Amino acid sequence: MRTVFVLFDSLNRTALGAYGGDAIATPNFDRLAARSVTFDQHYAGSLPCMPARRDLHTGRLNFMHRSWGPLEAFDNSFADVLRDKGVYSHLITDHVHYFEDGGAGYHTRFDSWEFIRGQEYDPWVPMVAPPLDRFRAEFSDKHY
């Protein structure tokens, strides 16, 4: 079994063609939705983003417990459930809050994870030059 769980932060479903949005073309998302299981009757139970993520991870309403925080030791995340069923899970995220104090635990439930830097308040600034040009500029005139 292969499972890809796609979560977009602060994206209204009406922005995607697969859900009837027509303001912009979203052919890649539309193709993905056509080949996937989609949720048509899901509503956020807790807001904003991190409490909503805890809802999704645990299947419980976060606002009933607290406003903001990490997954707790007693929380059963969907990544835990997948692992128990023999399904490997991998997280790819640009969400820096997963790695800050108070947001810890969300990424650790997955079998593996990858953090794409440079979003939100992450101080890292990516290089945008093509790799070969960037390395030539950095090292071609250096003699060691």
Residue ranges and their predicted role:
Residues M1-V37, S46, R83:
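Active-site-proximal N-terminal segment of extracellular/periplasmic enzymes that hydrolyze or transfer
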Residues D22-A25, A44, G69-N76:
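A short beta-strand-to-alpha-helix junction
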Residues L11, A34, T38, P51-A52, ...:
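Residue-level signal for pocket-adjacent positions within structured domains
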Residues R13, T38, N62-R66:
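Short helix-loop boundary/capping segments at the starts of domains
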Residues G21-I24, C49, F63, Y98:
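Short, electropositive, low-hydrophobicity segments enriched in small/polar residues
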Residues R53-Y144:
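Catalytic-site neighborhoods of secreted/periplasmic enzymes
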Residues V37-A44, Y88-D94:
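Conserved S-adenosyl-L-methionine
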Residues H42-D55:
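Short, surface-exposed acidic-centric catalytic microdomains
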